[in-house]
Structure formats: C-alpha cells, structure tokens
Amino acid sequence: MTHCRGYRAAAVARRRDLVTIGLDAEPDDALPDRVLDAIVTAGERAWLTELMTAQPQMSWDRLLFSAKESVYKAWFPLTGRWLGFKDAAITVSAADGTFTASLLVPGPAVNGVTLTSFAGRWLARNGLVVTAIAVPATSSGPT
C-alpha cells in the first residue's frame, strides 16, 4: 500500500503466486534537505550524481528514496524485522526502468533460498515516481 499527494495504490496477490510485494509512490520532487545524506550509500551517491547531471529533469534522489521504501515493504513481511535505509544498496537502470537492491545484511530465506537482492521496476510520470518489487513464490534464486 502507498499514498502521497494526489495518489493512492494497493497491490494484492495470491500467496501461491507472490511471497511479497513492495510498492511506493512519491512526488517527483527533490528530497527535503538532509534526507539524502540519511539514506544514501557511497556507491549510490556515485550513480546518483551521474544521473542528476545527465538528466536533471528527473528527481533521481526521490527515486532512490522510493526504491528503498519498496525494498522495506517487500522485506518486512518476510522477516518481521526493521531494515535501515543503508542496509540495501540500490542500482538504477535509467534505460529500462528497473532497479536492483543488493542486501547489505543477511537476507530472508524464500523456498529454501536465501535472498541477497530484490529486483524492481520504476516509472516516473505525471509528477509521480512509483517503484515496485514482486518476489515470485517459485523464486529459485536471488531476486
């Protein structure tokens, strides 16, 4: 479930199809002062700086924040544990609207396989940034 100014969304699935879903929506605006420093890893700062320079019309910092929110929302139902903003390192593909979240802490086991990452998709349109993660129930490896 997610909501922000002018937008609300929920996602549901059968447990036999998906083991977890993470969904977040944010306004496509720059993050408030000092928020970025609280959430960004050194590796993320490198790609973020590059994308903000190459494509300044997009709020890449907000996309990073949204992706981390989706990671947490996918993580918590599997573990029942808190995941800090710096406990996952996000990489973004600007070309195809995907992102990967590499877990920097031990991940949960799904179907006997320990997850080391989550794969997600993102979209920026109509003043919103939306990110989503869906882990299939038949996952046979890291996702």
Regions found by a protein language model. Give the residues of each.
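Core catalytic alpha/beta fold that binds nucleotide/phospho-ligands
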Residues: 1-143
